[in-house]
Amino acid sequence: MSRKNQAPKREVLPDPLYNSKIVTRLINRVMLDGKRGTAATIVYYAFSAIKEATGNDALEVFETAMDNIMPVLEVRARRVGGSNYQVPVEVRPERRTTLGLRWLVNASRARGEHTMKDRLAKEIMDAANNTGASVKKREDTHKMAEANRAFAHFRW
């Protein structure tokens, strides 16, 4: 592995339809095998289905869903005196978004609807209503952090 400097972070361009960087990141998360066009079609169809079902702006529903999914705390393993402790730490903003998108897409893929378009739309709507597997994942993460609160003094 190279010992040179860390590669610079590449700027994510906003998507053409909603002019939003987080939508571009969602498209990149949904994308499989480099098929960005297919991923964009899935996301845009899901957004149109959300607008149809709720009557609200799809981007607002998506942002509400992301606020409900993104974790504030998580646990990290820390080795102290020969034993591992799960230490609760705050999540940095960039990682919050990344985890939220990851959990949203994974929960969508695990759903039972017929197409990915429908799965994604339903999961986003569920997350906006504080239900669904992605919100449960966040709650589980927060519960773990709360349960290990006694080890918070090991934070680094």
Curated annotation (Swiss-Prot):
Signal peptide: none
Entry's Gene Ontology cellular component terms: small ribosomal subunit
InterPro entries: Ribosomal_uS7 (IPR000235), Ribosomal_uS7_bac/org-type (IPR005717), Ribosomal_uS7_CS (IPR020606), Ribosomal_uS7_dom (IPR023798), Ribosomal_uS7_dom_sf (IPR036823)
Manganese in keyword set: no
A GO MF label: structural constituent of ribosome
Keywords of the record: Ribonucleoprotein, Ribosomal protein, RNA-binding, rRNA-binding, tRNA-binding
GO BP of this protein: translation
Pfam families tied to this protein: Ribosomal_S7
Assembly behavior: Part of the 30S ribosomal subunit. Contacts proteins S9 and S11.
Family: Belongs to the universal ribosomal protein uS7 family.
Function: One of the primary rRNA binding proteins, it binds directly to 16S rRNA where it nucleates assembly of the head domain of the 30S subunit. Is located at the subunit interface close to the decoding center, probably blocks exit of the E-site tRNA.
Name recorded for this polypeptide: Small ribosomal subunit protein uS7
Organism whose genome encodes this protein: Streptococcus pyogenes serotype M12 (strain MGAS2096)
Taxonomy of the source species: Bacteria, Bacillati, Bacillota, Bacilli, Lactobacillales
